[in-house]
Swiss-Prot record:
The modification Phosphoserine is found at residues 237, 257, 261, 265, 284. Highly expressed in liver and lung. Detected at slightly lower levels in heart, brain, kidney and testis. Detected in fetal and adult stomach and small intestine, in adult ileum, duodenum and colon. Expressed in bone marrow-derived macrophages. One of its GO terms (cellular component) is cytoplasm. Residues 178-196, 209-244, 265-281, 298-308 have a biased composition (Basic and acidic residues). This is Transducin-like enhancer protein 1. Pfam families: TLE_N, WD40. One of its GO terms (biological process) is regulation of DNA-templated transcription. Belongs to the WD repeat Groucho/TLE family. It comes from Mus musculus (Mouse). InterPro entries: Groucho/TLE_N, Groucho_enhance, WD40/YVTN_repeat-like_dom_sf, WD40_repeat_CS, WD40_repeat_dom_sf, WD40_rpt. Homooligomer and heterooligomer with other family members. Binds RUNX1, RUNX3, FOXA2, KDM6A, UTY, histone H3, HESX1, ESRRG and the NF-kappa-B subunit RELA. Interacts with HES1 (via WRPW motif). Binds TCF7, LEF1, TCF7L1 and TCF7L2. Interacts with SIX3. Interacts with EFNB1. Interacts with TLE4. Interacts with FOXG1/BF-1; the interaction is inhibited by TLE6/GRG6.
């Protein structure tokens, strides 16, 4: 790793005995640190391998249990048939002649005398027949030559794993699997298995109930909270969750705190945070306030188990999650996995696809050569990754094409060909040339260019992707604002002095010009006490704040008064507002409503002047072009729409396969970034069909904001991450890990500060270092 010969330092003459110097000591420490990293990585791989083996064993257990249950049912059925036939024989025999009666009675008695030799012969014959029927899928599963193991005629013997799956499908109607898969990734997400009884006392592991659709959005209410203590382990399956609901991380919510009316729930940028991936059900008795859409929002439960640590900035290159959705899963029909699976096989196939997706490259023994892994500074800031982001993004076009083909193969098949263990690097993705597995840092590609026809290719980043004027090097946490409730909305004043944090029933104002201030300078009580603030926007003059949330009214605050006061309220027909936008001339306010409409308000006359109708479900996020002529909205109906504000009509519609939770329009034009429930970030060109697809988040992307220079943007997610990306191709500039879900974010007008709001009841202020 290091050259053997070093130039003599000023403290060590060339001819003097060897003497430790500070730089060499630091180098040695770095070597040991990287060795520990390698050990950690190998242990992590071993853990993942064991988890995969465990899952496979559970699958086989369920298959065999279904076999046993089906055989038991068939045995009882045949026994009952035999009894009824015996009764019929007993009734019919007396009508025969005496001679025939004796012959038939003897034949019946002989039929009842089945010897072990006959049983073995019958079983062997059935197995041979099944082997011919299985078309060479492997040897049949041997059955014990014992009456209790007699194979009934209705269920042929099975051959190999394919036959096991076939049997699972055949018997699925008899065994009502009540199972669920709660996957947790790395420190935040662990495999947790639960078992729930069925009407037939069938116990099966939870890892087989999940569907690929991770839509678990509960809506919180007081009666739900009362039920939670008794029923916290009895959660509905993921597939039953309302597609409209999101999850707010309220791991530290006071269990005794009051809850809101059951009509609303906290959403960030128009999204119900309760809609996010549900965590460990038994970890916390907490829940939060309610939800918003009157159309189809259901009341559910959630309990999110989070560690309440201070935000930690990662000191290594951001790495795509090992089970990340493979490229093309969002709005790329050409790469979707094939359909046509039998319904009963879907839980097993989905489980395999979720647990066995393969990364495009495999980290080597050391995460990266020395000098390529960014190290944390003395203040905990994250340094620029530099060359560590080269990876697949800087290789030759031929290699990129091969990697894209490998990605397509992973998507097409849904899982790796190796099941039950972690394959060695050279076996992970056969389509990738061997030399790609050894790229610097071993980092899989996380940014893909998608053409109009769905072709995907890893993006080769330009040399100035992470350097140049206006591109940050890292971000440093400088302040923590303890709001006391889940922070679903944040905004920064211009000039940068005050930060506004929206929580439950109030907006708190913080003076960040004096970092020592630990208390808000004022508190603006809005809506009802138990309803969450979903969005707050400052007018450019800095004297007016507009607040929306889980209520049908928007509050307009006069901040220039000696004491901030509400100077007007705007009332709409929708029960909740999920996001707000202000026109550049400050004359018009746009609100995203839970009924899918976009309300247009005249701020001077305080009247509703228009509604844009098009979203078929709640409108979750919104942004406006700098010239004030075009509006972009995202919705829970899986669409992004653009509107012409001069003509009052819809211009474009982009359809996706995932709900839209956040979006941002680049201030310099051309690019629109969209945050998905599927954990992807997609950057669309507003005039061309091609786009970029970014894969670094491990869960739902809850908020997104462009820097005012337009050269970079940030996104936050349920995975506790704050990611900074280069516009438009998504080179990762820096990454910050907080201690809970990051629900909201904002960037100051001078691009020097970032504020995030999180589920652990606080906002975090970062200074952007250039």
């Amino acid at each position: 790793m290091f050259p053997q010969s070093r130039h003599p330092t000023p403290h060590q003459a060339a001819g003097q005995p060897f003497k430790f110097t500070i730089p060499e000591s630091l180098d040695r420490i770095k070597e040991e640190f990287q060795f520990l990293q390698a050990q950690y990585h190998s242990l992590k791989l071993e853990c993942e391998k064991l988890a995969s083996e465990k899952t496979e064993m559970q699958r086989h257990y369920v298959m065999y249990y279904e076999m046993s249950y089906g055989l038991n049912i068939e045995m009882h059925k045949q026994t009952e048939i035999a009894k009824r036939l015996n009764t019929i024989c007993a009734q019919v025999i007396p009508f025969l002649s005496q001679e025939h009666q004796q012959q038939v009675a003897q034949a019946v008695e002989r039929a009842k005398q089945v010897t072990m030799a006959e049983l073995n012969a019958i079983i062997g014959q059935q197995q041979l027949q099944a082997q011919h029927l299985s078309h060479g899928h492997g040897p049949p599963v041997p059955l014990t030559p014992h009456p209790s193991g007699l194979q009934p005629p209705g269920i042929p013997p099975l051959g190999g794993s394919a036959s096991l799956l076939a049997l699972s499908s055949a018997l699925s109607g008899q065994s009502h699997l009540a199972i669920k898969d709660d996957k947790k990734h790395h420190d935040a997400e662990r495999h947790r298995d639960r078992e729930s009884g069925t009407s037939n006392s069938l116990l099966v592991p939870d890892s087989l109930r999940s569907t690929d659709k991770r839509r678990n959005g509960p809506e919180f209410s007081s009666d739900i909270k009362k039920r939670k203590v008794d029923d916290k382990d009895n959660y509905d399956s993921d597939g039953d969750k309302s597609d409209d609901n999101l999850v707010v991380d309220v791991s530290n919510e006071d269990p005794s705190s009051p809850h809101a009316s059951p009509t609303h729930s906290p959403r960030e940028n128009g999204i119900d945070k309760n809609r996010l991936l549900k965590k460990d059900a038994s970890g916390s008795p907490a829940s939060t306030a309610s939800s918003g859409s009157s159309s189809s929002l259901k009341s559910k439960e959630v309990s999110l188990h989070e560690k309440a640590n201070t935000p930690v900035l990662k000191s290594s290159t951001p790495t795509p999650r090992s089970d990340m959705p493979t490229p093309g899963t969002s709005a790329t029909p050409g790469l979707r996995p094939g359909l046509g699976k039998p319904p009963a096989m879907e839980p097993l196939v989905n489980q395999a696809a979720a647990g066995l997706r393969t990364p495009l490259a495999v980290p080597g023994p050391y995460p990266a050569p020395f000098g390529m892994v960014p190290h944390a500074g003395m203040n905990g800031e994250l340094t620029s990754p530099g060359a560590a982001y080269a990876g697949l993004h800087s290789m030759s076009p031929q290699m990129s094409a091969a990697a894209a083909a490998a990605a397509a193969a992973v998507v097409a098949y849904g899982r790796s060909p190796m099941v039950g263990f972690d394959p060695p690097p050279h076996m992970r993705v056969p389509s990738i040339p061997p030399n790609l597995a050894g790229i610097p840092g071993g980092k899989p590609a996380y940014s893909f260019h998608v053409t109009a026809d769905g072709q995907m290719q890893p993006v080769p980043f330009p040399p100035d992707a992470l350097i140049g004027p206006g591109i940050p090097r890292h971000a440093r946490q400088i302040n923590t604002l303890n709001h006391g409730e889940v922070v679903c909305a944040v905004t920064i004043s211009n000039p940068t002095r005050h930060v506004y944090t929206g929580g439950k029933g109030c907006v708190k104002v913080w003076d960040i010009s004096h970092p020592g201030n630990k208390s808000p300078v004022s508190q603006l009580d809005c809506l009802n006490r138990d309803n969450y603030i979903r969005s707050c926007k400052l007018l450019p003059d800095g004297c007016t704040l507009i607040v929306g949330g889980e209520a049908s009214t928007l509050s307009i605050w006069d901040l220039a008064a000696p004491t901030p006061r509400i100077k007007a309220e705007l009332t709409s027909s929708a029960p909740a507002c999920y996001a707000l936008a202000i026109s550049p001339d400050s004359k018009v306010c746009f609100s995203c409503c839970s009924d899918g409409n976009i309300a247009v308000w005249d701020l001077h006359n305080q009247t509703l002047v228009r509604q844009f109708q098009g979203h078929t479900d709640g409108a979750s996020c919104i942004d406006i072009s700098n010239d004030g002529t075009k509006l972009w909205t995202g919705g829970l109906d899986n669409t992004v729409r653009s509107w012409d504000l001069r003509e009052g009509r819809q211009l474009q519609q982009h359809d996706f396969t995932s709900q839209i939770f956040s979006l941002g329009y680049c201030p310099t034009g051309e690019w629109l970034a969209v945050g998905m429930e599927s954990s992807n970030v997609e950057v669309l060109h507003v005039n061309k069909p091609d786009k970029y697809q970014l894969h670094l988040h491990e869960s739902c992307v809850l908020s997104l904001k462009f820097a005012y220079c337009g050269k970079w943007f940030v996104s936050t997610g349920k995975d506790n991450l704050l990611n900074a990306w280069r516009t438009p191709y998504g080179a990762s500039i820096f990454q910050s890990k907080e201690s809970s879900s990051v629900l909201s974010c904002d960037i100051s007008v001078d691009d020097k500060y970032i504020v995030t709001g999180s589920g652990d009841k606080k906002a975090t202020v970062y200074e952007v270092i250039y």
